[in-house]
């Protein structure tokens, strides 16, 4: 068995790939496997053609030597006639219709027969792009329908508001307050501070927040449900006071002088001590 690589070359290649083999026996086994693989490939190859020198991109028609390899291997070209990937888009109402258009190819028959894989790869690429465009168009149509529904609801609510205002002016202040309360209760609270986006763009939300309306809504809720303040702290103080008064406080005897400190050092500010 011939040695195709040395240990230093193989170790450098492993180091470049990010692998490290510290065990010598394991490294020797790995080198023997690599030599066996290369020897097997050399035996399977022909005398005039070396498999190891063959390009990896020959099957993708990227390498210039691909046409010579296909001619030598007699590639079948009869079953590789593919459909034209060119697609036309026509508008029908709110939707688009895609149709395949058969156009005259810019390449002659000889070039198409020489590169059949190229047409196959281009067709696959165009089909994947076509599926991606259909997905994007479906998403945009959904967003447009949502925005149209939201605008219709907003127009209906504005018309209802005008009718309610006219009725309240004709009837009186009492009916106006009742209608405003009913109107507030009928609207969902989660959509009070949201408004529809006028110019809808793909990938953007169909609605956005109105900070002024949201602030007034929160302010009204805060006024209705104020945070606990002095009453909670006062109850906590009473609990602490009750806990401290469970034990009797020791009384101080004025005649007892044990608590006074005896200073051995003669302090200079004597009046301060007296």
UniProtKB/Swiss-Prot annotation:
One GO process term, biological-process aspect: cilium assembly
InterPro entries according to UniProt: Centriolar_ciliogenesis_assoc, HYLS1_C_dom
Location, primary (coarse class): cytoplasm
Biased composition (Polar residues): 171-183
Phenotype of the disrupted gene, per the record: Embryos do not show centriole duplication defects, are viable, and develop into fertile adults, but only 10% of the normal number of ciliated neurons are observed.
Annotated Gene Ontology cellular component terms: centriole; cytoplasm; non-motile cilium
Region (Disordered): 156-188, 255-274
UniProt keyword annotations, A-Z: Cell projection, Cilium biogenesis/degradation, Cytoplasm, Cytoskeleton, Phosphoprotein
Subcellular location: Cytoplasm, Cytoskeleton, Microtubule organizing center, Centrosome, Centriole; Cell projection, Cilium
Domain of life: Eukaryota
Disulfide bonds: none
Biased composition (Basic and acidic residues): 257-274
UniProt keyword Phosphoprotein, yes or no: yes
Pfam families recorded: HYLS1_C (PF15311)
Keyword Cytoplasm found: yes
Similarity comment: family membership: Belongs to the HYLS1 family.
Function: Plays an important role in ciliogenesis.
PANTHER family: CENTRIOLAR AND CILIOGENESIS-ASSOCIATED PROTEIN HYLS1, HYDROLETHALUS SYNDROME PROTEIN 1
Subunit description: Interacts with sas-4; leading to its localization into newly forming centrioles.
Protein name: Centriolar and ciliogenesis-associated protein hyls-1
Organism, as annotated: Caenorhabditis elegans
